[in-house]
Amino acid sequence: MSDNDTIVAQATPPGRGGVGILRISGFKAREVAETVLGKLPKPRYADYLPFKDADGSVLDQGIALWFPGPNSFTGEDVLELQGHGGPVILDLLLKRILTIPGLRIARPGEFSERAFLNDKLDLAQAEAIADLIDASSEQAARSALNSLQGAFSARVNHLVEALTHLRIYVEAAIDFPDEEIDFLSDGKIEAQLNDVMADLDAVRAEARQGSLLREGMKVVIAGRPNAGKSSLLNALAGREAAIVTDIAGTTRDVLREHIHIDGMPLHIIDTAGLREASDEVERIGIERAWQEIEQADRVLFMVDGTTTDAVDPAEIWPEFIARLPAKLPITVVRNKADITGETLGMSEVNGHALIRLSARTGEGVDVLRNHLKQSMGFDTNMEGGFLARRRHLQALEQAAEHLQQGKAQLLGAWAGELLAEELRLAQQNLSEITGEFTSDDLLGRIFSSFCIGK
């Protein structure tokens, strides 16, 4: 397998459909056109032609599009064949194309990878293609499109350019100490560094929003049996996702629902009631419940309000609270307010949010929805926003740490070489986002998660 091979893949989803598309990229795409179509179509014009087998018989007929490189998605010669979407027809056409020497099936994401390697896209834009395909809401799709069009990359490149100018100034002062460049008296370096750090903080804040929009928040509903966990899942989901009975321990396994609150994706997980297991099936369900709790972004501690008047989670169930991960945020949900007559709404107890509601009637559930949105700092007005991945957040955080360390050098003993090194490392972290400095292993992991024909 060589990166110089001409590659082919189906660009439409597998299965039956009105249209099926095969995409070919590489220097032999021209030969494919001449062999299968009998001619080379006019560049960037749709041509309706028969697709022929080796013996001259017609396999299908459809539209052929020819994009000679470098003016194509991948930067190479690209041919697209748009025929009927039957799997048998597409398979016959694909087999015909693969009889031509030098062609092979594309790896997942290889078309986008070639676009990146040929400077048609930077890495953040290439990732945005997959994010746009996987978008689960209108807001996520718009933000992914913004990233694909370069919104995120432009912000990162602006930071990289600012760091370049700052490094030039610092390193000139180090290399030419006899020149009249005084770091401390004019304050230029500190002022420029503060500007870069402020811009970086703004990008980090937007990236956290973009990551939340892409990844969603994992919320686990946990508590004793018959506290109303499954009823709350149904209320949040707006449908009967879980079986609800008066029998304690009805839920034996993990149930998952994917919902949106004003565009924010939420992964709601209902778990088995926590108690001493009565049988092996329940024991496994409780083990899985704790596994989900340990991986949660937030736990909704469900309390049956008819069984206790306590509101402090440490008082309600100290053993449960003691077992939770130290920094895991919890929200206490006192359920069955329709029976207890408690006042609906939210308050705070010892640093924990406390919400009184009725999962059965739905009263107070909107308060919980707003709380979940606000607890993650989600901004529903993200016009011009972009999507971000975990690796982007890590790169931005590392860049911020290097700038903080560089500023400490500047304001402390003034070690010019150490400041210059911190600036270089921060610039490298930022450049990893767009792919200016990226290892081959990382590229492989990123593009292998793409669709085959992308």
UniProtKB/Swiss-Prot annotation:
A Pfam family that this protein carries is MnmE_helical
Q: Which UniProt keywords apply?
A: Cytoplasm, GTP-binding, Hydrolase, Magnesium, Metal-binding, Nucleotide-binding, Potassium, tRNA processing
Enzyme Commission designation? 3.6.-.-
One GO MF term attached to the UniProt entry: GTP binding
Where does the record say this protein resides? Answer: Cytoplasm
The entry's free-text remark on the cofactor is: Binds 1 potassium ion per subunit.
Q: Which stretches make up the TrmE-type G domain?
A: 216-377
- What InterPro entries does its record include? G_TrmE, GTP-bd, GTP-bd_TrmE_N, GTPase_MnmE, MnmE_dom2, MnmE_helical, P-loop_NTPase, Small_GTP-bd
Q: What is its main location?
A: cytoplasm
Keyword Ribosomal protein present in the record's keywords: the answer is no
Q: List the disulfide bonds.
A: none
Which residues does the annotation say bind (6S)-5-formyl-5,6,7,8-tetrahydrofolate?
R23, E80, K120, K454
What PROSITE patterns does its record include? G_TRME
How would you classify this enzyme at the top EC level? hydrolase
Which family does the similarity line name? Belongs to the TRAFAC class TrmE-Era-EngA-EngB-Septin-like GTPase superfamily. TrmE GTPase family.
Q: Which PANTHER family match?
A: TRNA MODIFICATION GTPASE GTPBP3, TRNA MODIFICATION GTPASE GTPBP3, MITOCHONDRIAL
Report the function annotation for this chain: Exhibits a very high intrinsic GTPase hydrolysis rate. Involved in the addition of a carboxymethylaminomethyl (cmnm) group at the wobble position (U34) of certain tRNAs, forming tRNA-cmnm(5)s(2)U34.
Q: Which NCBIfam families match?
A: mnmE_trmE_thdF, PRK05291.1-3, small_GTP
Q: Note the subunit structure.
A: Homodimer. Heterotetramer of two MnmE and two MnmG subunits.
Report what the protein is called. tRNA modification GTPase MnmE
